[in-house]
């Protein structure tokens, strides 16, 4: 059944491109992942013929004999292609497992989403949009989506595995980070978000729970609408993460990529202090403090970090420090110990 299901381009709606990352341009698909095994995961669908919704691939033979031969050699993934390991986390729409692709022995995080839950919440189009956004992104500090497939009941996302898990869990253990670690994270974030913004992608939800750690401790931005590891239930409201909301969103004004600048300012404060800057006993008080930018620093926060945070947490989005200047900030330059992972060298 899984093979037959995968003959269709997308389990919802009238999407006309074929399943997997075949929805992306060849230029994007040919960007080299970290390993040959990762490249194989990304390119699994490259030689398939295009099928319209409801068409079986076998019925679409107008692409020529070369493409047809390639299709026979590169079948869509099914769950049988993977060995499933321990659970990495649970989310509203499904679970995440450590997994290994049998042929290549390549380790991944396999996100399994239940169609029934997605349909119940009416978020089919959001899921499709978020998959396409993350699939286009290739940066050493962004968790990579290698591919996806589906069967009758589930949708599977094949994701890069981040061995050291959530940044949030490490922050819980240590309560605060030192200047070196915080500055390193700020440099990694500014670089990754600069890349995103150039591609017209706004994350909107930068927070410790959505930041993962690679083998060398390098930052990996995750959750472009869908968590990869176990999501936390803290700081949730129906309009997003309360403590990280910028003034323009609270006030119902139009927002743009400048919201990410506000978020990394809040994050920098939380990493240094142990709690968000506008955290209050009630939602209404938190809203009030955000709108007024009621920012107070404990004496433990060094002056350089205070300067950076103050320049990011501006009520007027256009007055916030640009990402290029975040990476070049004297405090970041003096303290960052950023080490690029092998895939970036």
Curated annotation (Swiss-Prot):
Keywords: Acetylation, ATP-binding, Cell cycle, Cell division, Centromere, Chromosome, Cytoplasm, Cytoskeleton, Kinase, Kinetochore, Mitosis, Nucleotide-binding, Nucleus, Phosphoprotein, Serine/threonine-protein kinase, Transferase, Ubl conjugation. This is Aurora kinase B. It comes from the Eukaryota. It catalyses: L-seryl-[protein] + ATP = O-phospho-L-seryl-[protein] + ADP + H(+); L-threonyl-[protein] + ATP = O-phospho-L-threonyl-[protein] + ADP + H(+). Serine/threonine-protein kinase component of the chromosomal passenger complex (CPC), a complex that acts as a key regulator of mitosis. The CPC complex has essential functions at the centromere in ensuring correct chromosome alignment and segregation and is required for chromatin-induced microtubule stabilization and spindle assembly. Involved in the bipolar attachment of spindle microtubules to kinetochores and is a key regulator for the onset of cytokinesis during mitosis. Required for central/midzone spindle assembly and cleavage furrow formation. Activity is greatly increased when AURKB is within the CPC complex. In particular, AURKB-phosphorylated INCENP acts as an activator of AURKB. Positive feedback between HASPIN and AURKB contributes to CPC localization. GO terms for cellular component: chromocenter; chromosome; chromosome passenger complex; chromosome, centromeric region; condensed chromosome, centromeric region; cytoplasm; kinetochore; microtubule cytoskeleton. The active site is at 205 (proton acceptor). It comes from Mus musculus (Mouse). The modification N6-acetyllysine is found at residue 220. Belongs to the protein kinase superfamily. Ser/Thr protein kinase family. Aurora subfamily.
